[in-house]
């Protein structure tokens, strides 16, 4: 019988993580469970840094960005002896179950713990929206608002100077954030990890835009595809138009979560407790067509793929 659970946030922070923690804690307390908050993700689990939470521990945090429990990247957690110490730390506090909030790297940690006999449930928290098994991840919509606001501001100055602006957006290997922001921000050109890209083809498209009378342009590009500073110099040389690159960076992770992220995080936090009390373990939470679902973590990591939104890309190209 489950009496105590732990909750942690891991990897890159995302707006709405606090709301998810709150959802876990208050749902668990309503089911007569005790909840330990674990500081700084898997690192804190290994270092035995935990605190017993009550309903007041999560008061007034639903509107706060970041994660009050802290987060960290801890690659040593992939070592079995490190995980054994983490499990021992939880067992010493009579913790029966662990809820992990984070991205696919955090999912791997939860999967490894479950395989070692310590049951876990994972909640998707990442602005990249790159986790399989869910339409949206916690933090994505807030980051999207941040990116679009930045694009709007860049457009003001780009139009004033008849400049080409390149804006680099987070997302790793997933272009969802870039694509959505490009549509909402009216970007003229989009470069995504899912679509083959050459700088020559991009310049050709930009020149075609100039021939049509475009005085300025915004190019939205997902991080890690290329060096955007070098790309800006290349475009400027080939088009004879002033070109500047802006890397939005970690500002995309900050700020108060928007309404949808607060609701999504609250629902996922509640649902995680619901399914662990039903006896499920080694599962990850998702939302499909606004309905809460759960999948096997291993299946989500190895077999499930996020479908690329080709219809959204078509929309974006039609509106260039």
Curated annotation (Swiss-Prot):
Active site per database record: 128
GO BP of this protein: canonical glycolysis; fructose 1,6-bisphosphate metabolic process; fructose 6-phosphate metabolic process
Binding positions (ADP): 22-26, 55-60, 155, 186-188, 212, 214-216
Known cofactor(s): Mg(2+)
EC numbers on record: 2.7.1.11
Binding site for ATP: 12, 73-74, 103-106
Record entry for activity regulation: Allosterically activated by ADP and other diphosphonucleosides, and allosterically inhibited by phosphoenolpyruvate.
UniProt KW keywords: Allosteric enzyme, ATP-binding, Cytoplasm, Glycolysis, Kinase, Magnesium, Metal-binding, Nucleotide-binding, Transferase
Swiss-Prot/TrEMBL catalytic activity: beta-D-fructose 6-phosphate + ATP = beta-D-fructose 1,6-bisphosphate + ADP + H(+)
A molecular function (GO) term: identical protein binding
Binding site for substrate: 126-128, 163, 170-172, 223, 244, 250-253
Record pathway: Carbohydrate degradation; glycolysis; D-glyceraldehyde 3-phosphate and glycerone phosphate from D-glucose: step 3/4
Cellular compartments annotated: Cytoplasm
Binding site for Mg(2+): 104
GO annotations of cellular component type: 6-phosphofructokinase complex
Record NCBIfam families: PFKA_ATP, PRK03202.1
Subunit text: Homotetramer.
Matching PANTHER family: ATP-DEPENDENT 6-PHOSPHOFRUCTOKINASE (PTHR13697:SF4), PHOSPHOFRUCTOKINASE (PTHR13697)
Reported function: Catalyzes the phosphorylation of D-fructose 6-phosphate to fructose 1,6-bisphosphate by ATP, the first committing step of glycolysis.
Family per similarity comment: Belongs to the phosphofructokinase type A (PFKA) family. ATP-dependent PFK group I subfamily. Prokaryotic clade 'B1' sub-subfamily.
Name the record gives this protein: ATP-dependent 6-phosphofructokinase
Organism: Buchnera aphidicola subsp. Baizongia pistaciae (strain Bp)
Gene assigned in the entry: pfkA
